[in-house]
Amino acid sequence: MLPTSLKTLVLLGALLTGPLGPAGGQDAPSLPREVQRYDGWFNNLKYHQRGAAGSQLRRLVPANYADGVYQALQEPLLPNARLLSDAVSKGKAGLPSAHNRTVLGLFFGYHVLSDLVSVETPGCPAEFLNIYIPRGDPVFDPDKRGNVVLPFQRSRWDRSTGQSPSNPRDLTNQVTGWLDGSAIYGSSHSWSDTLRSFSGGQLASGPDPAFPRNSQNSLLMWMAPDPATGQGGPQGLYAFGAQRGNREPFLQALGLLWFRYHNLCAKRLAQEHPHWGDEELFQHARKRVIATYQNIALYQWLPSFLQKTPPEYSGYRPFMDPSISPEFVAASEQFLSTMVPPGVYMRNSSCHFREFPKEGSSSSPALRVCNNYWIRENPSLKTAQDVDQLLLGMASQISELEDRIVIEDLRDYWPGPDRYSRTDYVASSIQSGRDMGLPSYSQALQALGLEPPKNWSALNPKVDPQVLEATAALYNQDLSRLELFLGGLLESHGDPGPLFSNIILDQFVRLRDGDRYWFENTRNGLFSKEEIAEIRNTTLRDVLVAVSNVDPSALQPNVFFWQEGAPCPQPQQLTTEGLPQCVPVTVIDYFEGSGAGYGVTLLAVCCFPVVSLIIAWVVARFRNRERKMLLKKGKESLKKQTASDGVPAMEWPGPKESSYPVTVQLLPDRSLKVLDKRLTVLRTIQLQPTQQVNLILSSSHGRRTLLLKIPKEYDLVLMFNSEEDRDAFVQLLQDLCVCSTPGLRIAEMDEKELLRKAVTKQQRAGILEIFFRQLFAQVLDINQADAGTLPLDSSQQVREALTCELSRAEFADSLGLKPQDMFVESMFSLADKDGNGYISFREFLDILVVFMKGSPQDKSRLMFTMYDLDGNGFLSKEEFFTMMRSFIEISNNCLSKDQLAEVVESMFRESGFQDKEELTWEDFHFMLRDHDSDLRFTQLCVKGGAGGTGDIFKQSNACRVSFLTRTPGNRVMAPSPRLYTEALQEKMQRGFLAQKLKQFKRFVENYRRHIVCVTIFSAICAGLFADRAYYYGFASPPTDIEETTYVGIILSRGTAASISFMFSYILLTMCRNLITFLRETFLNRYIPFDAAVDFHRWIAMAAVVLAVVHSLGHAVNVYIFSVSPLSLMTCVFPSVFVNDGSKLPPKYYWWFFETVPGMTGVLLLLVLAIMYVFASHHFRRHSFRGFWLTHHLYVVLYALIIIHGSYALIQLPSFHIYFLVPAIIYVGDKLVSLSRKKVEISVVKVELLPSGVTYLQFQRPKTFEYKSGQWVRIACLSLGTNEYHPFTLTSAPHEDTLSLHIRAVGPWTTRLREIYSPPVGGTSARYPKLYLDGPFGEGHQEWHKFEVSVLVGGGIGVTPFASILKDLVFKSSMGTQMLCKKIYFIWVTRTQRQFEWLADIIREVEENGSRDLVSVHIYITQLAEKFDLRTTMLYICERHFQKVLNRSLFTGLRSVTHFGRPPFELFLDSLQEVHPQVHKIGVFSCGPPGMTKNVEKACQLINRQDRAHFVHHYENF
């Protein structure tokens, strides 16, 4: 009786293995209660994994590693493996076996080993113990290159081992460690199912029932290429249970033998038990075949191999460990290798030995071993009879002598790994022993209780002493270093030596006694005693006879020996003579034939942007054609609107500017007018009777162009539709000039030359600008470097330009005024001494000298002379009135005629001249007595020293100018204490380094928030890159990819992490609603939300650069992967590749186009090329719709990115980690935007204001609620319904309509200005409608929470305050109770021209502010070094005008205009004196960061005092 615990274990094993019932017969259950598993599990019920496939080898002797853990011993600790192979195993073939062992017994031994052990599978991560071939090796290095290295990849090991010296590395056995027929049925259930036919209990056969079917992809047969022919693939390889069962036809024949024997047993069982099903038949046949196999291997082959009989079987020993030892692997395989002959005979049952053809006319007596490795469709083994003849031939052939010699077929021509077709079997076995950490020969003897030899000569007396001497020399005469494998070979002669014999016998005994399913174990219930006896009497000869039907007399009784008198002796002991030569080693170039295709593929990918550019160019051409058609229609409609004598043409303004349509009118008064398409006069040319007019006609390019050269003017270049149109215009011009004395001179030249000779407006302006600078340099002693230099071009056109004179229009433009202004008329009349209607440069210089260097008396006299219109030496009231009127014209006519008369009277009365009707120059100068210092412009100096720019209009620091207030009687009062408002002047730094430093400081100052955000974002991206780069470079678990493509994987994975982050968080820059909300929070102080679009572009550009680097990294990876062997690729990509021995890696095109990451990567590059090209500024200008449509490919982009990373080729998908949160936010933001309906908004009013500003007033939707200072996005239906642009609202929340002031600075705003030109009929019906989206942005809403608020606007940053000021005035006029009692509004701007459009808004604020709630100051920072004559010459008038009328001459406003920068610190300090009872003052600034920083700094300095606290809120534009 079994113990209770053992019964329990047996029952557990039965449940786990699954008892099988009868398949459908009427017999009693035919299967035993337990069927042996295929994978070796649960053979031992206590130690379930013992002997299972994948279990580790069990050492007999402690491991011998270099580090005691896993590092193999290598040179120089041990000799070179190839040298050892040459020294120990080299020799001639042809010596017969000492005991006449047959070749059949030899290859049966190999078959048994394939059933027991398989450690050839390379391990992962890949580690190499390469074999370095000595220079000049006759086989592997015949060219004496000295760089030949045969790769040897270490075998697969148990990952739980190799951790410490107490747990060294152990290899794993890939097959079951039991003698259970796994070489016949496979080592797993799935493998066995693939081999079965599931019909009649048989194994599946091919077209010929005597052969199994060919190997299939689902069956992991080893498919190494034929080293002789290079042929590969599964075709011609049979499906066996042993993975390497097709290595040689001789091993293949034994596999076929057992295949046929199983099917024979199944047929017999089916005849005996016709009611059994397939499973019963298969399992009973398998059981019988395994038992027969065990019997032959242990009781027939092993004694013949060892010349020892194993001990009698004493029953199953459950505590016996049958695990295969690495020492057994080395001993058995290496000893068998000494017996392999160079060829194998084939014969029939009549003892006829076959001949085989070879090169030439001769024949070969045998199959050459070296040329039959992994051979496909062997012509000598086509039929079952051929297989039988091979088996009979092996039974008659005597193997090689069991000694140290290994024939060259193995030693020099063994199938090689990777790129090499051949390798050294012995050297590979030596490396394999070192890989397994085998002990030395002496250590193994001592561990097994055997006596080690004392010296080299005592090792084996039968070995040639020269061999021992050579071996000893390689080991430095140290016998203790001799390795187990070589020592075992040297001790063997005729039989295995004592070491190998003990190891092999011990292994087989443990396998038998520890196997619960051993056929002699009567307790397992597999066989009865009679069946066991029958099996014990079955021999391999019986199996051969049964499956081949040969005459038993054709075989000796024991086919493992050939004795004298046995049938069919071999013709001779085979040598290499008479056999075909072994095919030499070849080196495979994996990339051969792929270079051109790989290059073309990369070139095609690089051409994606080029193709996208071509597409964009085609789209742009179509858009330009449409634009030309529109222009053509416009010209046709323009013809109908122009006068009858108008001639349509295109004016060419210059070489880098686009031509535009004009209409040229020739008027009877000999004037020529050029009008634009809106009939606005662009230019008027007065043809004087005495002028010589030159007309140059083009003689090429259709003869459509003409050049009109008028003296003292820049040239006019016109391009007509045809030569006929041009000739018609020439005729009209000739008719106009017929009465002129000089007449019209006409010439012809080539069009290119004509355009080159033309003096354009831009050229004229450039020459005049430089000349003006030279004049000022002479007048003001300005440094020549600051003034600029004259052009060095001495061509005729430059000389003509320098000698020309200024027209009235050019003179007005130089002053920044209109030609029809009275001031221009007076000044021009005064300067034009010769009265020819032009001012020469000398005449201009005379005026300039007085203004710049003259004394106050000279300047007042010049002004007096200017307005002494009748020249009588007196300035009448009427002339004084005219002078004041000219000033008022400059200031936008802010005063009526009556108001101006009142001002003149008050000025006369204030000076004591109320009774005079005329003023002498002395009276006039007395009237300007208070402005003597202002008239001293002689202090204008830009040399940079004391008295430089900082002295312009210099005021005493002690002077304080108040915000002037008006009393009900219109008298001016100055409340005390007063505010300090004088402008601060800055000195210019002239040094190059100082200027660069200042520029850098200003840049950092202006973009500090941007820099911080970009730095943080870049740091995160760099950190992600560094993390992945470090991980794959140093810290990743060994996967071989970092060893295979170190640079490529670092670049590709590092950039992939950064790109994933960038493409994820770039979505946040497009969440407008979220940005609008966050701008109203404290985060706006730290994050420049207004720069979201710029940040979007920056991220996109950085991402595409990294994408290119990522692609380059993968280009390197693809090349390296294409030249790496399959064994290495299996380690790198275990989920993609299976190492089946085929060696050849996938080609480059597989990586590019047949993998998900490759194909999606190519598509991603294509999408990116399209999106980025169409998003360029140039193309957006030509076709915004194309940009908009292609940018919607971002949906495809993200889909491809997700698919690209989901394949997990290198690592698990990680894009979702970055993408999920931004995507949810972005989708939510989009849903909010989609919830707003697009309503067409009608435009109510349009005004074209100066400085290119367009005023739009449009309907306000009923549900539109906003705060003053917010902005909206509008789309003009005529310019595209999807193209939105943001603008700040300048209307107040209480107004019924919305308004915008849009400055034309880009293509869209320019086109908008053209489209909204005032219609002819004066109605708004023809105005295109708008789409409105918003409001967005932050409103400065806390101004009303302070009793005193200061609003500071810089440049265009004043626009939010326009809405706030109007809102403020409305609330105050409505009597709304507000905490705020006083508003100070300061606007800092470069030049007065920038605020012309805002004057009406500020004037409205001033007129409606009944309680003087708002005080306005304007600071103009542009100084006279810019040579703005108007700023210089009108300064005196501004101060006097402000004093007399309490209005600015420049703006017509009560606000004071200053020149320079506001003194924020002094102003805020004085504000505390004006409002001593106020304890908290709000400061709101909006503009460039430099200005808001100065305000912030001033507030911080003032807040250090124990007085009023200034709370600063700012917003940067």
Curated annotation (Swiss-Prot):
One Pfam family it belongs to: Ferric_reduct
Family under the similarity heading: In the N-terminal section; belongs to the peroxidase family.
EC numbers for this chain: 1.11.1.-, 1.6.3.1
Name of the gene: Duox2
Glycosylated residues in this chain: N100, N348, N455, N537
Species this chain originates from: Rattus norvegicus
GO terms of molecular function: calcium ion binding; heme binding; NAD(P)H oxidase H2O2-forming activity; NADH oxidase H202-forming activity; NADPH oxidase H202-forming activity; peroxidase activity; superoxide-generating NAD(P)H oxidase activity
Activity control note: The NADPH oxidase activity is calcium-dependent. Peroxidase activity is inhibited by aminobenzohydrazide.
Keyword Lyase annotated: no
UniProt-recorded name of the protein: Dual oxidase 2
